[in-house]
């Protein structure tokens, strides 16, 4: 058990540090500190020895040089059970430092400001802090090292239970956390500096890219049972990584992927919306004046494919909707909240996974999207674009009616979340046929028609969305034969005139958005 007699505390994040230091003092721990931390502790009555007084060497260079001294680093690095180390410590008057509590200058927060200058960024690169942290973490067998205020309580509790000591397993865990922290810190610095162009302005993508993820949980298996898998969080907050599982079996790899796609889709809509997702694709999507109606129509969009799917809603789940969900075979349901009267209804299906996710409009993704390929990593911005009706260009002789425009806006939002080549048919806030993942656009158009007819939907007067341009008129002809009267697509084909002519021949209103929404999974 590592007994603690001397601690060095130097933090930029002062949450809880005064109470932590006061409790250490109650254990008889001698406390060393620096600069602003020392002032904060002394102002609250904690007895502190300034590092400069301890080393006999003052702070220099406007505080840049404070702790880089043999009396500090020797006290952190010396092995307590090595006689040559203890002999040298005695010879040079270097007492052991048993606990180090340090967090670093706020570099990431500083560069997050759009008007951050290079000088400001460089001044917020911590030198002494990482050096001490690495020294203490390397010598974890003799030193307890803390970099996170959230760990103060656990260390104090262990000291209470162990007469002022901290166990080896805790020291090792905290040391591991330190190396992850300093790696992330140095990675942020490298990312920032390598993103600066010759003019000093930041480019979108840095020359070197350092990423860090923390394991949220092991998964039973991956996409298939023979694949091992785990789920990692990136620390940005939000998304399924921060959702609360209220009941049901453990999440699977496929649950997480489908759940992410499902929630992202429904959060595109301001009105109550529900969707059912299977294998990364929406089976049915609907909006309505209330959640129950939206769910009923989403399920009806393709009840065959929806069997065993993932349901997401963008409103708190009520009892009526929960009753309907519990009568159908669903793997998982996600909503911003589960209302109290809905909980016992869902609980009857003990294996049903139920998750509450953070709402706001905060689901919109920030940062970058990654795709691993052999030998490298593809990086892009998330597709956050969604073109408003004011951005549309009517290219047909006939403009869409008010209702057709509503239908076009609806299917266009859905189409963004369907695997390419994607065609979505819909009317009055409900999908009635989806052609997903086809190698040709005309096949996607025909698949959507076939699905609609199989389910008994009448496509006369329906709207169609295509995630990319029509390379030939055949897709328009197929949709027209089914009765479609309004089409929304990006445009941009060398045969746009031929495609527009087809729309005009069939009396179809066609609009171009100018933006493509490929989705390749």
UniProtKB/Swiss-Prot annotation:
Residues 1-147 form the MGS-like domain. Its EC number is 2.1.2.3, 3.5.4.10. Disulfide bonds: none annotated. Keywords: Hydrolase, Multifunctional enzyme, Purine biosynthesis, Transferase. It catalyses: (6R)-10-formyltetrahydrofolate + 5-amino-1-(5-phospho-beta-D-ribosyl)imidazole-4-carboxamide = 5-formamido-1-(5-phospho-D-ribosyl)imidazole-4-carboxamide + (6S)-5,6,7,8-tetrahydrofolate; IMP + H2O = 5-formamido-1-(5-phospho-D-ribosyl)imidazole-4-carboxamide. PROSITE patterns: MGS. It comes from the Bacteria. Pathway: Purine metabolism; IMP biosynthesis via de novo pathway; 5-formamido-1-(5-phospho-D-ribosyl)imidazole-4-carboxamide from 5-amino-1-(5-phospho-D-ribosyl)imidazole-4-carboxamide (10-formyl THF route): step 1/1; Purine metabolism; IMP biosynthesis via de novo pathway; IMP from 5-formamido-1-(5-phospho-D-ribosyl)imidazole-4-carboxamide: step 1/1. One of its GO terms (biological process) is 'de novo' IMP biosynthetic process. GO terms for cellular component: cytosol. GO terms for molecular function: IMP cyclohydrolase activity; phosphoribosylaminoimidazolecarboxamide formyltransferase activity. It holds the Pfam family MGS. Belongs to the PurH family. NCBIfam families: PRK00881.1, purH. The IMP cyclohydrolase activity resides in the N-terminal region. This is Bifunctional purine biosynthesis protein PurH. The lineage of its organism: Bacteria, Pseudomonadati, Pseudomonadota, Acidithiobacillia, Acidithiobacillales. The gene is purH.
